[in-house]
Amino acid sequence: MNRRGIAGASAAVLLVLAGAVWAAEHVVTQKGKAFSIKKLVVKVGDTVKFLNEDPFSHNIFSLSDAKSFDLGSYGQGQSKSVTFDKAGLVEVECAVHPDMKLVIEVTK
């Protein structure tokens, strides 16, 4: 590999590492059959950790175009995380408790 190839590869590695360093983790708790907040703004690459503080299970999901996911059922003290890789609005709900709703705005 020539010097340009090495420099290019090094720059690519640095960009990947920089993206990982700047990504943030946000924590949303579930307690009293409700999310701790109604709206959250995150950036592309950020992760949201959903922490269950209720004495029963939740099943957090989204069918949104910007991010579709289903975390499955998880109990008290457990958490599951989602990383957002595309800008847009993500409507989050609980399959067990239909009144639980959260909007996540993912920005660039």
Where are these regions (language model features)?
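Extracytoplasmic copper-binding redox domains, predominantly the cupredoxin/blue-copper superfamily
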Residues: 2-108
